[in-house]
């Protein structure tokens, strides 16, 4: 008949020092020595909490773990387009890669990888097609129906297939302002009153639409005129978030210095014109100012506008602004960033950085 053996003294004492008790388990059938079990004691914290924390790594879904593996080492976001890697394999999205090269040019330094500090350039870095394909297969939420789809199929789903996507009435051409989810479109069009309006009523609506169209054409004609100027410069700019040093800090954005038209510039942006508590407002806006950092010999008259960058999908209506820069007056007023609505503004605020493209046209007399 076998006996249960007690744990040796040193083991019991050392286990107690670790905040655990030594328990005994009888071997089934009475064969062989008993095994020692370490049981959590009260001093080691709630057992349920310990078990949950131990189970966390395995409970996280594969795609969620891949987000941190495949994200850009600079902005920590999943790449939306091309993915570049340094000679040691660290990943950078196309936007951040271009910014690193541009910043190094301004500082007259060799661009380096933010992780390992190895040299990077267009010739030293290469695209990682495997990561690009892996990212395109990761699931992402549709902003309308909140269902998940592979990132490569999400755009098509949002434009053509989603039953909750925002759509417009087919009678928009004769003035119907209705917008709503696609699954309500058929019911609305069957009840829409615009097809039954008289010719005189429709003429008033069409006159208003003509005025709107005329303003849009004036804007595009102005842009085409600017494109005929001799001195034109453009660059991708990256607004980075910062906090003021006030007692109640406020969010603002600023770009690194960049060079356009042989001059050094900076862009700054603020939320809701720096109101005290923008988080309490349901309406969100962004405004920006252009600052000339270089010294100039004579006044510099410029037109400028911001557009969406090549690697982002923010919706911006182009607006042309005009300013005469001098050494004494080198900052424009804060002007609205022409995003279409508060939803788009929230998308920008939720991103790590805001990537846009700036055009500057120098007006010569």
Swiss-Prot record:
Q: Tell me the segments the record calls region Disordered.
A: 1-56
> From what superkingdom does this record's organism come?
Eukaryota
Q: What is its main location?
A: cytoplasm
Chain intervals annotated as zinc finger (TRAF-type): 113-186
Which CDD domains did the record assign?
A: CYHR1_C (cd22861), RING-HC_CYHR1 (cd16505)
Query: Per the record's keyword annotation, is Hydrolase included, yes or no?
Result: no
Q: Entry's Pfam families?
A: Sina_RING
Where is this chain's protein located in or outside the cell? Cytoplasm
Q: Which GO terms describe its molecular function?
A: zinc ion binding
Q: Which cysteines are joined by disulfide bonds?
A: none
Which InterPro entries does this chain map to?
Sina-like_RING, ZFTRAF1, Znf_RING, Znf_RING/FYVE/PHD, Znf_TRAF
Annotated Gene Ontology cellular component terms: cytoplasm; nuclear envelope; nucleus
Assigned keywords, A-Z:
Cytoplasm, Metal-binding, Zinc, Zinc-finger
Zinc fingers (RING-type) at which residues?
A: 72-117
Q: Which family does it belong to?
A: Belongs to the ZFTRAF1 family.
Q: What is this protein called?
A: Zinc finger TRAF-type-containing protein 1-A
Organism, by scientific name, is Xenopus laevis (African clawed frog)
